[in-house]
Structures are given as structure tokens and as C-alpha cells.
């Protein structure tokens, strides 16, 4: 809805789930829903192409303000600057880190791998708190023979616990190998980001931070795509129409904010 996406005209992989399989310490809860899976590499490229914006790939090393403009590596100059580079965003690092420090207790760490795999079970599965994991693991089929598996948890609690994120990954993929993804081979990539906490300063002059650069992921499911989209739209409205840049309502809750959301927020943080 936020992206005005017409599913029928989307040209890439798009799979719809009518239920989630939620597993909590052996308890299996099939939950009716309407959820979708896409491949991010396809979806992000399609959104960028749809925007019609010119694209230049460049590794940012230096940002400075000069005469009402932002200068990036003496190669680019702009009146407005939006930091959408995730946790390590150079706009956040240069202009916002001291004004808007992140809370270590809200940091997550994740291991994930998306592979070509001829899956047989078409439903999304989520495992919460297995073996003391302060988070959850997932099995998400993608259309036409792709599969995303991953595991994530709260960084501080993992550091204080007996098992690392890699230990949890090994146990998780071993379980998958006996059930849902026999013979699959993984080479996971790791990344880190922050759940929503206080965001004291998200605009400085004509510079903005959005999405994971601002630390906006939901506190129940640690989901960042929705908050990234909504905060990006808020930044666009501020630039185009002079509206106040407000982030109070962009995060919300992945599960709707009811009892399940509140329990997961409490359990994860």
C-alpha cells in the first residue's frame, strides 16, 4: 500500500502465504495471514528503476557542509541529503552519530543466506527462542526455486549467553537439514541493525536519515523494510512540500501492536 504496488504488474518473483507456522519451544501455532515474499535484489532494483532517478554507484568517504549545500567527496553537490545506507550509513556517521547515539541494548545481529533450492514446503516458518536464542529463525520460500533462511537475536544478550550466533546457526541449519531443506548448503552473511528506540534528531538542516540509518526496525519482529519505506516517504514529503519530518508513526509493529507484539517486544528487549 505504501508503495502503490500493483501485484499483477510486478515482473519478478512474488509468492503469497496464507498462513505462518510459528513455533515457540516446541509449540506449533499455524496462523492465518496474508504475507508476501520477494527477492530483495530484484525488488530493490525494480523500485529504483520505477523511480526514474539517475543512479551513480559510489563509495562515500567524506561529507561536508558548504554554503548551504552538502559536498560528497568533492564529486557531488546537493541542497538536500538523505542517509539511507543502513546501520553504517556515512550520513549518519558524519552528521548524526553524536546527536542521535544508538542504544547497544537494541542492537541485533543476524546470519542469513538466500539460495537456489527446489523447496517442497511452500509456507513460511518462524522459530522463536530455540536453545535460548534471544530472537528467532526463519525459513521463507521464494517463488521459482529460491529459499531464504536466517537467524537473528539481540547482540548484548548473545554476548552474555553460552552460545554465539554461529552456534545457533549451526543448530538451526542442522534441524532444517532433517526436515525442510535436505541437502541445502549455506554460506551465510552477517549484518547488524537496531530496533526502534529514541530518535532524537533525524533531520539536521536539509540532511535526513531514514530506515536502518535511523534505527527504526520494529520491536516485535525486528522488521525494517516497512519503516524504511515510510520514513523515506516522510523525508520526500518534507523536501517536496515543506512538511515537518516526523518519525513517530513510521515504525509501528509487524504483528499489529496487539498482545503478540507486546509479548515479543518484552521477550526480545
Question: What is each PLM-predicted segment?
Answer:
Residues 34-35, 160-163, 220-224:
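Short, solvent-exposed loop/turn segments at secondary-structure boundaries
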Residues 191-219, 260-268:
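FAD-binding beta-loop-beta segment adjacent to the flavin cofactor pocket
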Amino acid at each position: 500500500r505504501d508503495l502503490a504496488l500493483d501485484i499483477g504488474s510486478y515482473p519478478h518473483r512474488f509468492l503469497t502465504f496464507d498462513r505462518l507456522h510459528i513455533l515457540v519451544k516446541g509449540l506449533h501455532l499455524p496462523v492465518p495471514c496474508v504475507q508476501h515474499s520477494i527477492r530483495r535484489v530484484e525488488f530493490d532494483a525494480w523500485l529504483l528503476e520505477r523511480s526514474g532517478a539517475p543512479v551513480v554507484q559510489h563509495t562515500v568517504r567524506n561529507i561536508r557542509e558548504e554554503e548551504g549545500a552538502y559536498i560528497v567527496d568533492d564529486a557531488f553537490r546537493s541542497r538536500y541529503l538523505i542517509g539511507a545506507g543502513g546501520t553504517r550509513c556515512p550520513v549518519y556517521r558524519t552528521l548524526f552519530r553524536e546527536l542521535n547515539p544508538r542504544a547497544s541494548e537494541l542492537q541485533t545481529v543476524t546470519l542469513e543466506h538466500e539460495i537456489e533450492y527446489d523447496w517442497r514446503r511452500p509456507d513460511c516458518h518462524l522459530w522463536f527462542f530455540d536453545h535460548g536464542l534471544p530472537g528467532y529463525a526463519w525459513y521463507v520460500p521464494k517463488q521459482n526455486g529460491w529459499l531464504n533462511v536466517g537467524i537473528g537475536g539481540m547482540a548484548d544478550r548473545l554476548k552474555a549467553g553460552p552460545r554465539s550466533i554461529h552456534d545457533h546457526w549451526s543448530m538451526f541449519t542442522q534441524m532444517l537439514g532433517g526436515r525442510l531443506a535436505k541437502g541445502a548448503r549455506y554460506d551465510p552473511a552477517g549484518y547488524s541493525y537496531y530496533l526502534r528506540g529514541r530518535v532524537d534528531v533525524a533531520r539536521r538542516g536539509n540532511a535526513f536519515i531514514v530506515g536502518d540509518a535511523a534505527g527504526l526496525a520494529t520491536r516485535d519482529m525486528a522488521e525494517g523494510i516497512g519503516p524504511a519505506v515510510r520514513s523515506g516517504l516522510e523525508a520526500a514529503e518534507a523536501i517536496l512540500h515543506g512538511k515537518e519530518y516526523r518519525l513517530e508513526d513510521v515504525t509501528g509493529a509487524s504483528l499489529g501492536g496487539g498482545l503478540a507484539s507486546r509479548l515479543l517486544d518484552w521477550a526480545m528487549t
